[in-house]
Amino acid sequence: MFITEPISNLKFKGTFHFDEGFYYFRNVGNRLLLGGARNKDFKNEKTYSLETSALIQKTLEDFMMKRILPKGSKKPKIELRWSGTMGMGKIKKPIIEELQPNVFCAVRMSGMGVAIAPIVAERVVKLMKG
């Protein structure tokens, strides 16, 4: 994943998915938050390492320039890059529950954590309020 420097006149607002959800991006103010592309290297993405992958990062940058930003755009500086492990399960539905009094979990986002985290958070808050 990465987030760019502010991009003047960023033309979109919202959360978007591409390639069956393997790519996801959204604006954060006038910055671009982009992640995914793990389907481009399944073998090496099955890891617990938190290191970024050069192949995935390059694939994301290429996607940004070819598919998201207008043709001829100056490439924005990437301000921060990171990666993480994904919680997968046989059922593609998050687990949202109270484990014991005042201990809640929201896990197994099946690779869609960035995209669905706001909705999951709302459900956890609702569960906490009873």
Language model region names:
Residues 1-32:
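Flavin-dependent oxidoreductases
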Residues 6, 27, 36, 82, ...:
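Active-site proximal loops enriched in glycine and acidic residues that flank catalytic Cys/His/Asp
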Residues 7-9, 39-40, 101, 110-112:
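Short, glycine-/Ser/Thr-/acidic-enriched flexible segments
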Residues 8-9, 46-83:
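Flavin-binding catalytic cores
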Residues 11, 24, 41-43, 88, ...:
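Flexible loop/turn segments at secondary-structure boundaries
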Residues 13-15, 45-47, 117-118:
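Short conserved micro-motifs at the rims of enzyme active sites and ligand-binding pockets
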Residues 37-47:
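Amphipathic alpha-helix from the class-I
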Residues 70-130:
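C-terminal catalytic lobe of FAD-dependent flavoproteins
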